[in-house]
């Protein structure tokens, strides 16, 4: 299984005046330590819980705007890009971003939030020799625009952000530079993150997340067959259906929400949770998505023998303009002329004109090589439960999680596995 997520923020100068020239380069800088000695560091599990809250809020808005489409997005990627932007946001612009990301400054300081992300990014940068996880941030700046040294230093130290200069007066040249960078970062998976740009753009921030892992118990490709998948009451499609028999894996039947939850582990640091609502119950399950729901599912999962598991093989490619989505959640000023990003340039002359998020997700029988881990916590009584058959032949949800902190890397919904 592999996924790649990328996000781009296009910013424009509100005023057309030319600002002092900057070379846009960065030197080496030690990690920012401000606040760490006096503030309690944000616990990684708390950070993951906050991210889950944001992830589910964002998902619900996506589902509302895309009721009949597959969904794939990276809450981690979006949160990382937005949070790096808070290094330069001020006033109400900053407050709106933090509120939508579910942070409460009365409980956690900005310094602790940034330190929490920094340590998480450091951990993800060293997942082990076999697991492939890579994150990256890049800032493309108009060659005549001056970026504050403090912002560049913190962006580099906390979010591993690279800074490049670009000639946005030549939009096609700038787009070529950005898309070439993203293509290299995503191994050619995302070749055209930015497809349109005008001469008013002065800054672009992009974020990418690459994750690839192998199932702990891979599906046998010889068992994959063409099976029926129900798109809606009047339509079904034939899709490649992966199959495995006599699998022992975490399972939970949620009678309250009328859905079945199955968890499959990856070799290495990750797991995938698949949620199959009973027919006609998808909206009920979606409405219930909140951190407490995920916590309940995680606590209720028990090893269970699945006599036969069917899961469609699918490949999704989704592209979202977040300037149409985030204002509905509460981030409005960022996309208006009232935006205050003076912590980036020193003056209030930058606004975000476009924010793009792209995700490529492949769910296959095997994946790539990785270190094996051992499933723990078996319940002796579960051996007395009858084996079950689980067939994902109707629309379902999926959540890819970090094994340790339960951070949501990617999540979404499959309505039609035959469509990208």
UniProtKB/Swiss-Prot annotation:
The record marks 381-382 as: Reactive bond. SMART domains: SERPIN (SM00093). The keyword Secreted applies. Glycans are attached at residues 104, 349. Residues 367-392 are annotated as: RCL. Gene3D superfamilies: Alpha-1-antitrypsin, domain 1, Antithrombin, subunit I, domain 2. It comes from the Eukaryota. Keywords: Glycoprotein, Protease inhibitor, Secreted, Serine protease inhibitor, Signal. One of its GO terms (molecular function) is serine-type endopeptidase inhibitor activity. Residues 1-17 form the signal peptide. It is found in: Secreted. The keyword Repeat does not apply. GO terms for cellular component: extracellular space. InterPro entries: Serpin_dom, Serpin_fam, Serpin_sf, Serpin_sf_1, Serpin_sf_2. The reactive center loop (RCL) extends out from the body of the protein and directs binding to the target protease. The protease cleaves the serpin at the reactive site within the RCL, establishing a covalent linkage between the serpin reactive site and the protease. The resulting inactive serpin-protease complex is highly stable. Variability within the reactive center loop (RCL) sequences of Serpina3 paralogs may determine target protease specificity. PANTHER family: SERINE (OR CYSTEINE) PEPTIDASE INHIBITOR, CLADE A (ALPHA-1 ANTIPROTEINASE, ANTITRYPSIN), MEMBER 3J-RELATED (PTHR11461:SF122), SERINE PROTEASE INHIBITOR, SERPIN (PTHR11461). Belongs to the serpin family. The single human alpha1-antichymotrypsin gene (SERPINA3) is represented by a cluster of 14 individual murine paralogs. This is Serine protease inhibitor A3B.
């Amino acid at each position: 299984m592999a996924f790649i997520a990328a996000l781009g923020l296009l910013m424009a100068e509100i005023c057309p005046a030319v600002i002092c020239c900057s070379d846009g380069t960065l030197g080496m800088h030690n990690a920012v330590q401000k606040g760490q000695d006096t503030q309690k560091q944000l616990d990684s599990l708390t950070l993951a819980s906050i991210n889950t809250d944001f992830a589910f809020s964002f998902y619900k808005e996506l589902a509302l705007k895309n009721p009949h489409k597959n969904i794939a997005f990276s809450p981690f990627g979006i949160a990382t890009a937005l949070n790096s932007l808070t290094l330069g946001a001020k006033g109400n612009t900053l407050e709106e971003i933090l509120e939508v990301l579910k942070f409460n400054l009365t409980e956690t300081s900005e310094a602790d939030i940034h330190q929490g992300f920094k340590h998480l990014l450091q951990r993800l940068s060293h997942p082990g020799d076999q697991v492939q996880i890579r994150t990256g941030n890049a800032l493309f700046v108009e060659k005549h625009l001056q970026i504050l040294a403090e912002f560049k230093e913190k962006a580099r130290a906390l979010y591993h952000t690279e800074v490049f200069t670009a000639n946005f007066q030549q939009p096609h040249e700038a787009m070529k530079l950005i898309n070439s960078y993203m293509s290299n970062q995503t191994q050619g998976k995302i070749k055209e993150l930015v497809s349109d740009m005008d001469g008013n753009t002065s800054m672009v921030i992009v974020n990418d997340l690459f994750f690839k892992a192998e199932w702990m118990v891979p599906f046998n490709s010889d068992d994959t067959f063409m099976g029926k998948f129900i798109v809606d009451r009047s339509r079904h499609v034939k899709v490649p259906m992966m199959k495995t028999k006599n699998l022992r894996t975490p399972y939970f039947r949620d009678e309250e929400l009328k859905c079945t939850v199955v968890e499959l582990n990856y070799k290495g640091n990750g797991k995938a949770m698949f949620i199959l609502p009973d027919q006609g119950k998808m909206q009920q399950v979606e409405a219930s998505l909140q951190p407490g729901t995920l916590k309940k599912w995680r606590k209720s999962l028990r090893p269970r023998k699945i006599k036969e598991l069917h899961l469609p093989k699918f490949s999704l490619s989704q592209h979202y303009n977040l300037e149409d989505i985030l204002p509905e959640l509460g981030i409005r000023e960022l996309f208006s002329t009232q935006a205050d990003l003076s912590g980036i340039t020193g003056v209030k002359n930058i606004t975000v004109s476009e924010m793009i998020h792209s995700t490529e997700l492949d769910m296959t029988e095997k994946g790539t090589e990785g270190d094996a881990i051992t499933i723990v916590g078996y319940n002796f009584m579960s051996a007395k439960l009858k084996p079950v058959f689980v067939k994902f032949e109707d629309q379902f949800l999926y959540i890819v999680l970090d094994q340790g902190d339960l951070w949501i890397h990617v999540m979404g919904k499959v309505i039609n596995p035959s469509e990208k």
